[in-house]
Amino acid sequence: MTGFKIRKLEAFCFRYPLSTPVVTSFGRMNDRPALFVHAEDEDGQHGWGEVWCNFPPVGAEHRARLINEMLAPMFAGRAIDHPSEMFDYLTAATSVMALQAGEQGPFAQAIAGVDIALWDLFARRSKQPLWRMLGGTSGRMRVYASGINPDGSAQTAEKAMQRGHRAFKLKIGFGAERDHANLRDLRQLIGDLPLAVDVNQGWSIGPALEQAPKLEQFHLLWLEEPIRADRPWSEWHTLRDKITTPIAGGENIAGREKFAAALSEDILSVVQPDAAKWGGITGCSAVAREVVKAKKTYCPHYLGGGIGLVASAHLLAAHNGGWLEVDANENPLRDAFCGAVGRVKDGEIELDETPGLGIEPDLASIAKYRTL
C-alpha cells in the first residue's frame, strides 16, 4: 500500500448537559464532553479519532485548539507510510513545547486522538477492519457496564442488565458505609455476575490498607486505582500483599517506559491503557502486546464519546484481552456513533468486517451540542 498525504485535519468539540452528574471520588462531571478528530487524505479517504477530555471541566476546547492550531499544520506536505510514523513525529516535535508549558497530558491526548483517526484512515485504505489489521482473529468480546455512580447504583445496574450487560463496575471511595451498602444492593441484584469497583485514586495508603480487605467479602473481579497512580511502588506492593482481589490500573499511566515499569513490578493483574488519553492505537497496541506477553489481563479503559469507545473495542479484539468498558450513563455523543458496541447481547458484542473503525459519524445529528 502506497503512502498518503493528509489534506485536512480538524477537531470538533461537543458537550452534552447531564441531568444526573457523573460522580467520582475526586470530582464530578456536569456535562459529557467529546472531542472528535477528522482526517482526510488527498485521495478523499478519511478517518475518525477521539481525544480524552473529561477533566478539567474546561479542557476539551483547549485540546481542540491544540489540534487545529498546532498539530494540523505539521501535516503539510508530509507523505505518510504508516500511522506510527506520525505518532512518533508529533510526539517528538511537541515535546519541548509540552515540557515548557507543563502540558504533557493535553498534548499526549491530542496526539492520541489524531493517531486513532490516522489508523482508521489507514485501515480503510487497506479495506480491512482495524481489529483484523492489528492481528485479531475474532471481533467478539465481553463487555461490562461502567461508571455506576454511588447514587442510584442498583437502578443504573438494572437498566444496564436490561440492555444486555452481564458484568458491572461500581464507583467507590465515598466512605465504607455507603460503599458497602451499594455493593450489597448490587450483589442482591446481579447475584454472582462479575462485579468490579473503582476508587478513582481516592484513598491514601492508610485507608486503602484498612478498606480494601473488607471488600473481599463481595468477591470482586478487580479493585481499580485504589491509591494515586503516582504513589511509590512500595505502597502498591504493600497493598497487594494484604488482599487477594486483583488490582487494576493504567488509565493514568502514560508512555511505553512507564507501562514497562508497571509490568516489571508485577502488581497490576488488570492493565488498562486509555487509547484516547495516551498512545492512540500506536502506543496502546504496543502496550497491549506486552500486557498479554506478561500474562496479565488487558482491559482498555474508556469513558467518553462513541468513536473512542469503538477504537477501544478494536484494540481489545486485536489483542484478545479481557473486558471492554462501556459507560452505563446517558450520553448521546457515545450512543449515536458506537455502532456494534451499542448492541450488547448476553454480555458480549461483536465487531464486523467493515473497513477501519466501521462507523461513519454524522456530526450534523449532534450539532446542537457543538461548542467549537
Locate the predicted segments by residue.
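Structured beta-strand/loop patches that form or line metal/cofactor-binding pockets in enzymes
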Residues: 1-48, 52-56, 330-335
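C-terminal extensions of enzymes
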Residues: 337-372
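Metal-dependent enolase-superfamily TIM-barrel catalytic cores that perform enediolate-based chemistry
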Residues: 132-243
